[in-house]
């Protein structure tokens, strides 16, 4: 990108006593993008968001907004409203008074703030609830009020800290669609913290994956899904079979990965790896094939016994175990599994093309 980033973290770290919550971080966030920061509990994602919001002060480094350092700028002067999981709505105010509140604090006149609040309630599809108290609303309706309250001030950037985690599955999916549509229509930069892969991948333009206070990978959902950079990312996403091993040469001089359950051919371009180097081969569970016998000409095949099956809607996930005790899984549409004679305890051969493998560093 040629323009300057809307937000930049330069060497930003956060320590609480002897504990480092965020190690030195460099991150650029661009105008108009939907950025998701994802990771398990304690990875530093919420601390990162709170530093941007002005609720935590960096221990070192500089945070810039529109090119200007904001480390010493109080939260109320940053134009970075935040939506929390708890929503933090005022129960003693009506719906429209909640939406008006930030405008009132900014000195906007009564008529103008009422007009803008009504516009956002209409936009969020909750205009009919303007006079109700917060306690009379459903979870999804409260979520829309919280969004309207944050967006009515027309910020450059909106921060969201796991705002959908308390909603049921169906409502969560609907709200994901609402959020993405709002972001596209307004052009406001969204920074969204979550532990949910489905939320991050369905909405974000780019995803940041964090672990133990460090960024593991930044990229589009497609790039991260297809090509995780590290063993941690592959494990965290949970969509790949992982074969840990070392780079070696087979009897024909070809570069392979030697693992406890066999030697496997590598994708093109892997010859540059050094023999003996510890790596892992990842293969998406959707790219694995199931057969009664070793497929003729297959370079990568491993025998395994079926140990379980999980119904996941339009697809099924079949679980296998190798003789060495490694669990593998295959995910396929139901129609692709109908003629395989699947049964718990039965032995099969799992295979994949070398081009479907991906090497990650340990």
What are these regions (language model features)?
Residues 59-62, 112, 212, 244:
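Conserved coupling/switch loops of ABC nucleotide-binding domains, chiefly the family-specific signature
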Residues 38-40:
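The feature captures the beta-strand-to-loop junction immediately N-terminal to the Walker
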Residues 61-69:
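Conserved ABC transporter NBD signature motif
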Residues 240, 250-362:
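Non-catalytic connector elements of ABC transporters
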Residues 46-49, 145:
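ABC ATPase nucleotide-binding domain helices that frame the ATP-binding cleft
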Residues 34, 79-81, 85, 89-235:
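ABC ATPase nucleotide-binding domains
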């Amino acid at each position: 990108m040629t323009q300057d980033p809307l937000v930049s973290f330069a060497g930003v770290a956060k320590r609480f006593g002897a504990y480092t919550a965020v190690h030195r971080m460099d991150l650029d966030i661009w105008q108009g993008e939907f950025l998701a920061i994802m990771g398990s509990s304690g990875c530093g994602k919420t601390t990162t968001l709170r530093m941007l919001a002005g609720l935590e002060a960096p221990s070192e480094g500089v945070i810039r907004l529109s090119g200007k350092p904001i480390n010493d700028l109080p939260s109320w002067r940053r134009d970075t409203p935040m939506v929390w999981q708890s929503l933090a709505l005022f129960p003693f105010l009506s719906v429209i008074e909640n939406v008006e509140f930030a405008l009132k604090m900014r000195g906007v006149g009564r008529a103008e703030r009422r007009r803008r609040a009504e516009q956002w309630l209409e936009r969020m599809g909750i205009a009919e609830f303007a006079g109700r108290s917060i306690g009379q609303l459903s979870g999804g309706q409260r979520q829309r009020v919280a969004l309207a309250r944050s967006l009515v001030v027309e910020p450059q950037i909106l921060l969201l800290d796991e705002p959908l985690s308390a909603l049921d599955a169906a409502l969560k999916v609907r709200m994901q669609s609402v959020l993405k549509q709002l972001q596209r229509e307004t052009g406001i930069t969204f920074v969204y913290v979550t532990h949910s892969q489905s939320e991050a991948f369905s909405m974000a333009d780019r995803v940041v994956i964090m672990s133990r206070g460090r960024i593991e990978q930044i990229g589009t959902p497609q790039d991260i899904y297809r090509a995780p950079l590290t063993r941690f990312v592959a494990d965290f996403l949970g969509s790949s079979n992982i074969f840990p091993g070392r780079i070696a040469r087979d009897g024909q001089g070809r570069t392979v990965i030697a693992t406890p359950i066999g030697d496997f051919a590598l994708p093109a371009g892997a010859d540059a790896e050094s023999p003996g180097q510890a790596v892992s081969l990842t293969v998406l569970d959707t790219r694995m094939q199931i057969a009664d016998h070793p497929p003729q000409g297959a370079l990568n095949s491993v025998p395994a016994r079926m140990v379980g099956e999980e119904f996941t809607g339009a697809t099924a996930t079949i679980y296998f175990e190798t003789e060495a005790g490694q669990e593998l899984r295959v995910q396929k549409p139901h129609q692709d599994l109908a003629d395989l004679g699947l049964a718990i305890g039965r032995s099969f051969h799992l295979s994949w093309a070398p081009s479907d493998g991906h090497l990650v560093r340990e």
